[in-house]
UniProtKB/Swiss-Prot annotation:
Primary role: Repressor of the lactose catabolism operon. Galactose-6-phosphate is the inducer.
Upper lineage: Bacteria, Bacillati, Bacillota, Bacilli, Bacillales
Keyword Transcription regulation on entry: yes
Cysteines engaged in disulfide bonds, as pairs: none
Top-rank taxon, per record: Bacteria
Gene name of the record: lacR
One Gene Ontology term of the molecular function aspect: DNA-binding transcription factor activity
SUPFAM superfamilies, sorted: NagB/RpiA/CoA transferase-like, Winged helix' DNA-binding domain
Listed GO biological process terms: lactose metabolic process
Official protein name in the record: Lactose phosphotransferase system repressor
Keyword terms of this UniProt record: DNA-binding, Lactose metabolism, Repressor, Transcription, Transcription regulation
Organism: Staphylococcus aureus (strain MRSA252)
Amino acid sequence: MNKHERLDEIAKLVNKKGTIRTNEIVEGLNVSDMTVRRDLIELENKGILTKIHGGARSNSTFQYKEISHKEKHTRQIAEKRFIARKAASLIEDGDTLFFGPGTTVELLAEEVNHHTLTIITNCLPVYKILLEKQTAHFRVYLIGGEMRHITEAFVGEMANAMLEKLRFSKMFFSSNAVNKGAVMTSTLDEAYTQQLALSNSIEKYLLIDHTKVGKEDFTSFCQLNELTAVVMDYEDEEKVETIKTYIEVVD
């Protein structure tokens, strides 16, 4: 195994496991401790991992800095549009829906083309898209409160007080990360608001692209097995199969 193959193998191992011990790499690749330490330094300099005491941690596992709303609109757009179209097919005339924040949900809002719907959202960009479609039979409501500027979603006591009184036939939402059956986001405020909407929804659909699977974020707000189904792309079959061990994935 040459150096480039070894670096590639170490990167695959740390990304798969999240964190890895130096001695695991030494034994797995049959190389010296000093060689592994040099390789870890090189991979850290490339931004692939972060060295920790006795090993390394994948930089793709934990989302230390939440990505801006603008940047999210440049990532996995084809996959997100595919997910949005599949999610739209689950909506029926007469539904009362809750749309959570997120760029994938914004794309779902663009796809919605029904005659009779009531849609409630706490996300300003989602509301703006839906407002253009409003008619006497297609009603759109925005939940107010304290706005998180990075997601342009309303959270906090005012938003939660309104949500507590509402009931939804279906909820469509996204998340920053899904790992070991837990669905995660970046703040406690947003997590609690999502939990309230979930508890008041009959059917619950999580919209995620494959890059979110195996990552972690600050706090979890639900478990996959509490949901109706997950809507995702099929770019990584292994990740799809991972999700299927917890919950149905919409075909």
